[in-house]
C-alpha cells in the first residue's frame, strides 16, 4: 500500500462514523413521517424549499429530506431504504463515490441525494451507461420524485433539441454521459441562445462511475463534420501491409497497442508506391494510412474486437460484449478495418468540437458516483476528480464462496473442464452465469454447451436486444447464461427471478405508462408486484438450497474491476453463491506476460492437459499482470488529461466568448476596440525603425484589405511619428465603422456583428482543432531531440492559439467592412418600447453558416473511440486529418534503418 492509499484509507473510519450519525438522525425522526398522510408527506417539498429560501443549508435539511424520501419510496415502490442505503446517499451528497456491492440497491440510493439537491431547482444530472437505463430509471425512480412534487425527465439519443431543452428544465434529469457531453458541445456550436439546451452544471451523480470516469476516459467526445475524402489510400495500404512480415518489416507491442515500421518495411512501401522518401513532408499523410493498416492487421481481430454484419464493420465492446451500431473508430482506423475486410469504406470527417469526459465532468460544481468496484482506482478518482471512495457496508453479510483459480495448459482443456462443471451443476438445477472475454469465446462456449445438451441463453454483441430479460431470469432454477460482460447491465440477478423487472414488463405489455397513467399504474404495480414476489420467493428458497448462483469466469480480464464485477453478480443481499475462474496458459492476459516457465514445468512433470494446477504463485503473477496493465492505462488517461488541459484552457476562452455573444453582450464596443488593435498592428508592421525605412505603400495596401481607408497616402509621405500615424488610422477606421452602420441601419449592424463574430470564430476554432490534432500526433517525436513533448505541446499550442486569435480579429474586421449582404424583413429581431416584436431588416442569409451533417465520436467502456451519424443509425466516417497533413509543410526526414512510429 503506497502513501496515497494509506492516507485515503486512514480517513475512511472517520467518514463512516459521520455517515452512521446521519443514519441515526434519520431513524430518530422516521416515525414522524410514517404518521403523515400522502398530502402531508408530499407537502414537505414546498416546506423544504421555503426553508432553503430563508437561508437554511442542505446539510441541515438532509435528515428530514432523507426521511421523506424513505417513506415516499416505501409507499410508491414498496421499498424502504436500508440504513446502509441512507449511508450511501449521504456519501453521495458529500461528493464521494459510494462503493456498494452488486444488489445493494444503488439505484434506490441515488433517489436520496437527487431529491435533496433537486430542491434547489438548479438541475441534477443522473448519469447512466445507456439509454435503456436512463429511460427505465427515470420512469421508475421518477415515480417517487413526482409523488414528492419534483419534475423528472430523461435525455435519450433520439430526442430533438426542443425536447432536450425541456428535459433539462426538470429538477432531475437522467441520461448517458455521451448525451450530456454532446449537448454541451452542441450548445457551444449554437448560433443563438434559443438553440442551447443545457442550463448549467450543478450536481451530477454518475452511476457505474468506474466505467464512465475510468474505462471511457481515454477517449474524448468529438463532433465531426465532412472533410476532404482520401479513401483510395485505405485499400492500397491494406494490400501493401498484407505482404509485409511482422518483426521483419514492422514490430507490434500488444501491451501498448502500438506499431513501429522498420527500415526494411519503409523500403518495401516506398518501392510499392514509387516514392523516394516516405517521410518527406508531401508524403506525411501516407504514414497514418500505413500505421492504421498494420494496426488493423495485427491488433484488431474479427469476432473479438469487431464483427462484420451486412457488409459493415461493427465494433464490439470488450467490457459489455455489445456491438455499438453506428459507432466507429476514429483517426482513420475504422476505414483501415473496412479495407482489410473488403467492405465499403465510409467517408472521412473532421473535428468541429471536442472535450474529454474528465474535463466535462470536472465542470460540475458538485460530482458524486456509485459503483460496486471503485477501490482499485481510488487514487485516480482522488487525483483527477477530487473524489473519495467510501466502501458502504453490505446490508447482510457476504457469504459467497470465491474458489481458487484453476489453471490449465491449453484453452481446449480449460473449456472442457468448464463444460463438465456446468453439466454437473445444471443437472442439480443450480443457476449458472459464465463470463467470457469476447464474442468469439462466448459463441465457442455456446456451441460446446449445445453439444453437451445444456439449454442456455447468450448475452453478447449479437443478442443484446433481449439482454435485460435474460439477466432478470438468470437466477431461476436451471438457468445457464453466457455473457461477454456483466458490467452496466442494469438489472439484478435475483435467485428465483427478478419480480420488479417482471412487474415492469407485465404492465408495459398491458399498455400502462408510469407517466401518463400514474394512479392506475401505481395500483396495478402494487398488485402485480405482490403476485410475482410470491411466485419468485418459493423458487428463491429452492435455489438457495442448491447453493445460489454459480459464477464461472472463463478467463481473467486486464482489469481486476471487471473480474470483481462478474463475481459480484453472485451472493447479493446475503444470498449464498459461489465463483471460480478457469484459466489457461493460452489466455490473452497470460500470453502477454510470458507463461513459458509454467508451461515448461508442467511438461517436465508430465502433467496431462486436463489436470489443472492451483498455484498461489501463479495467481499472484496474474494479479501483478493486471496491476501493471491498470497502471499503464492510468498513465494513458493522465496523459490524455494533461494534453487536453492545454486545449481546455483554450476551449474555455472560445466558448466563453461565444456565450457572451449569444447572451447579448456589447459586441459593438468590443469590435470597435478590435478594429483599433488590428489597424495598429498593421501600421507597426510597416513602420518599424527609421521613417525612411517605412513602407507606406505596402501599409496602405494591407490595411486597405481590412477596411476602406480614407487617408491620402501622399499626405503622409513626410510623416515621422508612428504614434500620430496610428491615431489617424484609428480615427479613420472608426469613421468608416460609423458609415457602415449608417448604410445598414443599427439593428442590421448589430446582427451582422454577432453573425460575423460567431461565424469567423467557429471557423478559426475548427481550423485550430485540426492544427492541434496534427501537432498532438507528431509531438512525441520531440523526445528524440531530448525535449519534453508535453512542454513542447503547451508552448507550440499556446503560440498557435495566439496566432489564431490574431488572425480571427483581422478576419472579423475585414468581414464587417467588406461583406456584401442582402437584407430582408424579419419579425422579432427588434422590439418596441412595450417589448413587442416588430418587423425590421435583418441579414439574409446568415453569414456563411451552412448546415453540416454531423457525426459524434465517443468512447466505449473500453476507452476506444467510435463514431455515430447524426441520425444515430447509419455509420459514417470520422475526423481524418489527411487533407491537413498533405498541406502541412515540414522538413523532410532522412531515412534511416531504424524504427519509425
Curated annotation (Swiss-Prot):
Gene3D superfamilies: Helical scaffold and wing domains of SecA, P-loop containing nucleotide triphosphate hydrolases, SecA, preprotein cross-linking domain
One of the record's GO molecular function terms: ATP binding
Primary location: membrane
UniProt feature, compositional bias: Basic residues: 882-901
Localization per record: Cell membrane; Cytoplasm
Entry's Gene Ontology BP terms: intracellular protein transmembrane transport; protein import; protein targeting; protein transport by the Sec complex
Keyword entries, A-Z: ATP-binding, Cell membrane, Cytoplasm, Membrane, Nucleotide-binding, Protein transport, Translocase, Translocation, Transport
UniProt feature, compositional bias: Basic and acidic residues: 871-881
Catalytic reaction equation(s): ATP + H2O + cellular proteinSide 1 = ADP + phosphate + cellular proteinSide 2
Record EC number: 7.4.2.8
GO CC terms in record: cell envelope Sec protein transport complex; cytosol; plasma membrane
InterPro entries: Helicase_ATP-bd (IPR014001), Helicase_C-like (IPR001650), P-loop_NTPase (IPR027417), SecA (IPR000185), SecA_CS (IPR020937), SecA_DEAD (IPR011115), SecA_motor_DEAD (IPR014018), SecA_preprotein_X-link_dom (IPR011130)
Positions of ATP binding: 85, 103-107, 492
Keyword Acetylation: no
Membrane topology: Peripheral membrane protein
Domain of life where this protein originates: Bacteria
Disordered as annotated region, ranges: 828-901
Role summary: Part of the Sec protein translocase complex. Interacts with the SecYEG preprotein conducting channel. Has a central role in coupling the hydrolysis of ATP to the transfer of proteins into and across the cell membrane, serving as an ATP-driven molecular motor driving the stepwise translocation of polypeptide chains across the membrane.
Quaternary data: Monomer and homodimer. Part of the essential Sec protein translocation apparatus which comprises SecA, SecYEG and auxiliary proteins SecDF. Other proteins may also be involved.
NCBIfam families: PRK12904.1, secA
Family designation: Belongs to the SecA family.
Protein name as catalogued: Protein translocase subunit SecA
Organism (species): Cutibacterium acnes (strain DSM 16379 / KPA171202)
Organism phylogeny: Bacteria, Bacillati, Actinomycetota, Actinomycetes, Propionibacteriales
